[in-house]
Amino acid sequence: ERTANKASNQSSAASGKSKKKKRKEITLEDYLPIDKIANGVIYTTDHRYVKILEIEPINFLLRSAREQQGIIFSFISYLKISPVKLQIKMISKKADINKHLEQSRLEMERESDPNCRQLQKDYIQFVRQLSSREAVSRRFFLIFEYEPFNVNRKVEEKEILAALETAAQTAKTFLYQCGNDVLVHDNEDEFTTDVLYTLLNRTKCTETPLPKRINQVLTRYMESGREQEVDNIHINEFIAPESLDFKHSNYVLVNGIYHSYLLVPCDGYKAKVMPGWLSLLINAGEGIDIDFFLHKQPKDKIQQRLGQQIRINRSKIKDASDTNADFDDLDSAIRSGYFLKQGLANNEDFYYMNLLITITAGDLEELQWRIQEMKKLLISQDMDLRSCYFLQEQGFLSSLPLVNLDKKLYELSKRNVLTTGAASCYPFVSYSICDDNGILFGVNKHNNSLVIADIFDSKQYKNSNIAILGTSGSGKTFTMQTMALRMRRKGIQVFIIAPLKGHEFYRAARNVGGTFIQISPASQNCINVMEIRKVDNSVNELLDGPTLDASALASKIQRLHVFFSLLIPDMSHEEKQLLDEALIKTYARKGITHKNESLIDPKHPDHYKAMPILGDVYDVLMETEDTKRLAHILNRLVHGSASSFNQQTNVDLTNKYTVLDISELTGSSDLLTVGMFVALDYVWDKAKENRTEEKAIFVDEVWQLIGASSNRLAAEFVLEIAKIIRAYSGAGIFATQDLNDFFALDDGKYGKGIINNCKTKIILNMEDEEAQRVKTILRLSETEVMNITHFQRGNGLISTNNNNITVEFKASNLEKELITTDRQELLEILKRQDKKVG
C-alpha cells in the first residue's frame, strides 16, 4: 500500500508493504524519478538522460493508399536508425480554449457597436458550450534516452547532450518526410517542464498554468522566510501533484482524478493490421492516453534464439497427433518463426512492442464506464485489453515520459514485430487545427476537436486566401456568412460581393451595423467606374517613405479597358486604340493628365477634382464616326435602362462590414459581369490603403469573372488580386458553385490559378462528376471523394497545410437567425417576431 497526501504545505507520499509495518512517509519530490531538467533534457534519478519531442500529427486516414504507403516507408526509414528504445505518447483532454475565449473577450471590450457586441457575447457562450460537449485536444510526443556506445567508458555531459541533439535532428529530418513537423520551442526546459506538469496535474494545469504554479511555490518560500533557498528549489516541487493515492487495485487517484492503467497482452493483437491502425485507439475520445513502446533487439541474438526455437518446435510436432490441439499451436509457432527468420534475412529489425493505455475520469462511475467502452471497442477489433490489477503504481510510473516501462508490465504485454509491423503502428495520425487567435469553423468529425483557424497567421499559412467549392444547396452561402460574421466580430474589415441572391446577406449586414449597397438599375447607389480615388497612403509612407510617383491616370485607364472589354467583348484592336484616346481626352477635359498633381483640386487641396462619368466618355465617343459603335453600346449605361451607372460615387466603404449586392443585374448576363468588376475594382482600391490592417474580400460566384462569360483581362485582374492581396494583409475568399464555368476559360488556367493561390480550400457537397474533377486538381484520395459526394448540408472538407480534415460547420442560434435561408427556420423566426410585436 502506498499513499500520498498534502501535509504541512508540502506534497508527501506514504509507503509500506504491510499494514502491520509502520508506514514511512516520503515527499513526492523524492518519489518522482526526476532529478532535474536542464538543456532541454530530463535527468532521472537512475542516471539516465531523456529527451522529449512534440510532434505535429497529420490526417493519415484521409490520405490516398499510395500516400499512406509512402508515409509508412518513411517511418520505416526512421525506425532503422532510431534509438534502441522509443516511447511514443499521446495525451487527450478537454480542449483548453481559454486563450481563445480571453482573446474574444478583449475584442468584445474594444467593440463599439451594440449589435456586434451581442454577437460576440453569443459567440463566446457558443464556443464554451461546444467545447464542454465535444471538444478534445491531443498532443503527441516522441521520447528517447541517451544510449552509450560503450558502457565501460566514462562519457562527459556535453557528449551526452550532443548525442541527444543529433538524435532529435535525425527524428526531425525523417519525420518531416512522413509529413510531420517537430515543434520548436523558444525555451526547451520550460516546454519539458510544462509537459510533465500537464501530465501530473490533469485538471489543475488548466486552472493553474505552470507560470502561476511557479509563482505560488516561490511566494510560499518567500512568505516562510526561506528566500535563500529559492535558487535551489527542486524541479519536482513545481510539477508534482498535490496528492497521490495507490491504495486501490485497479486505479490511482492523482489530485482527485481517477487514473486506470490497462495493457494489451502479448496475445491480444490481431495477426494482420492496416497501416495507421493505432488511430482506432488514438481517436477513442477524451480521457484516453496511449503509450506505445518500441525496444529494438540485437539481431544476432534473436536469429540464434529463433533457430533454436524452430528446431525445438519441429521436434515436438513430430510427436503430436494432427488431431491434437497442441498440433495447431506448434504449427502456428513454426510458421511464425519462419516468418520472423525470413524478415530478419531481408534486413528487417526485430522489436518488442508494448501498448499501455491510461484512462482518466472525474469519478469512479465514469471511469468504469470508459474502461468497459474501451474494452468493447478493442473486442470489436479482435483485440484484448486487460487492467493492470495490483500494478497500477507501476502503470503510473511507466506512463511518465521517461522511456522506462516497468519490467512486469513489459513481460505481460511484449509483442514481437519486425520493422514493417512496427511501422504499421505509425501513431501521429490525428490532425487538428486550434489557433488561439482564429475563428471557429466547426468540429473535426474524425477526432471531435474544435477547428479554430487563424488564416492571417503567416507563420502557419503561406497566404490567407480561401477557395469554397460546392454544388447548389451544399451550404456555401451559409459557410461564407458564418466566416464573415466571425471575422467582423474580430474587428477584421469585411467586404462581400454578392452577384446572386444578394438579399440573403441583408439581414446579417443590418444586424451587425453593416452597410448594404445595392447596385442595380433601380437603385440610387452608384460606384463611378471612371473615378480616380484618393487613396490614404499615410501608413505606407510611414513604413516605406515617400511613394513612387506612378501615374494614377495610366493605372485607371488600364482597368477601364477591362471594364469596356466586358461591356463590348467584340472590340477590334483599332477600336481599343480609339477608346484609349477617347479616355485620355475625357480626363483631359476635366484637367486631369498623367501628372498626379493635376488630380488635386486647387480650391480644396485635400480633395481631387470632380471626376468624369460614363456620360462624358459617351460624348467624346460620339464625336467621331469610328467610335460611334462603342458609344451606342455604352448608351444603355448613360441614357438607357442602366443609367444608374452614370453618376458620381455616392457610397462609402469605411464600414467594417460592407455588402455590395449586384444580384439585380442578373437579368442581363453581360451587365452582371460588368457590375461585379466595378464592385471588385472599388473594393480593391480600398483594400490597398493600409497594409497593416487585416481585411477580407468575399467574392461569391467568382466564376462570373474568371469563367466562360468573362474574358482574359477580367480573369487576370481577379487572379492578380489572389496573388498579391497577402502583401496588403488581406484575404481573398473565392466561392463558386459552377465548377464547369470556373474551369472553362483558357482550359481552366484561371480557375486552377485561384485554387493554387488559396492555401486553404473548403470543399462542400458535390455531384460525382464535379468531385472527380476536383480530385485531380486537389489530389484527393478516393475516400475523400466518396465523402464529398455524400456530405450532408453543413459538412465539408477543409484542405490546408497538406492536411485534409472533415468538418461539421457549426453556427450558434443567433448566427443562424442572421444568415439562414431555410424556409422552416425562417417561419420560426417570423413567429418569434410576431410574438414580440404582439
Please name every model-derived segment.
Residues 1-428:
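Extended, folded cores of ATP/NTP-driven motor/assembly subunits in large transport
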Residues 37, 436-521, 715:
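Glycine-rich phosphate-binding loop of nucleotide-binding enzymes
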Residues 41, 53, 58-59, 65-81, ...:
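P-loop NTPase motor domains
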Residues 49, 140, 493, 656, ...:
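The start of beta-strands in P-loop NTPase/AAA+ ATPase cores
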Residues 123, 129-130, 149, 164, ...:
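P-loop NTPase motor core of the ASCE superfamily
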Residues 500, 734-739, 766-767:
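A short beta-strand-to-loop transition that corresponds to the Sensor-1 phosphate-sensing loop
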